[in-house]
Amino acid sequence: MSRLLEVSDLRVEFSTEDGIVHAVDGISYGVDIGQTLCIVGESGSGKSVSSLTTLGLTRGRNASVSGSIVFDGRDLVTLPEDEMRSIRGNQIAMIFQDPLSSLHPFYKVGAQLTEAINTHQSVSRSAAKERAVELLAMVGIPDPQRRVDQYPHEFSGGMRQRVMIAMALANEPKLLIADEPTTALDVTVQAQILALLQELQDRLGMAIILITHDLGVVAEFADEISVMYAGRIVERGSDKQIFLAPQHPYTWGLLKSIPRLDTPRNEELVPISGRPPSLIQRPTGCHFHPRCPYVLDDHKRIDPPLTPVDGDPGHEAACLLSTELRTRVWKGLAAGEESAQLRHLVVEEARPLPVSGSHRLTQEADQ
């Protein structure tokens, strides 16, 4: 497969009265034609900001953007706004998490669909409406000839999200960004929407970036997964690598907090302790160390880079523990062992790390 999107060392900072918000801090990833990349993380991890920046939607908002976002051979970071408008909603489209607030309540859905069509295509009003009916049928809305003349409040939550998908696909984009598209929906409708996206991807050949806080949502949908924390990617790999052999304590926490049908009835979910850090005054060393059950003194001063797991560049993690020790800890967690017991294993077997050029040493918190 050929590369469609290449994000390199992307940094997005916002100037506020309280200081500089480091929303995205040097992330890199790529998406191939027809591929699905899932970006997972808690609220405030930077996953949505990175995608909004891809669409040029952070421009003029006290934002400083550096790095590159190369889409189809053009760097979107430096692209003039008039050229960006020809890409936004056309070659790259986005679905937002709340369809009710994304759709205008005073306009019929057909009018909103035809507006999306006419923005990038020179077609007649009748041809645009005919296309709108086709789009509603394509996303599984029954009786599209009648429903194209209805208002958003006349649709259920799941049907409104289907309308948003239809609008995003109006111009057959090469890349679809779906930002928490199932958050406001019940579990059954979530599965229907994800199945619809996968079906449309197979039919149209587009790439998808799915943004979510729930690893359970992406289990059978992702080709690759990037886990974000505090503006950085802390682990990335294939779906099998992330679910079967995760290598970062934050990923472990996300996985252990997912409800599973095969979990014993008396086994409780394990929440991730603490809260995400301030992106203005970030922790020294590993940004996850204040919440990590396996933190050692070295982790509070050394900032770990993403490094290949067992030499595999397709699976990387930003953790100072050895791959062997991380693997043993995860196997213990998967078998139901307590974090306290596994922490004892880490303390006993981890060796102090020398500071080298491959590790960033931080002496104090960001000012």
Each model region followed by its residue ranges:
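Conserved ABC ATPase "signature" region
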Residues: 74-75, 127-146, 255-256
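Conserved ABC transporter NBD signature motif
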Residues: 63-75
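P-loop NTP-binding/switch modules centered on Walker-like glycine-rich loops
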Residues: 56, 177-181, 185-267
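Conserved ABC ATPase signature
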Residues: 150-155, 159
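Short catalytic/signature loops enriched in Gly
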Residues: 3, 142-146, 238-353, 359
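A short, proline-enriched helix->beta-strand linker immediately N-terminal to the Walker B motif
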Residues: 170-174
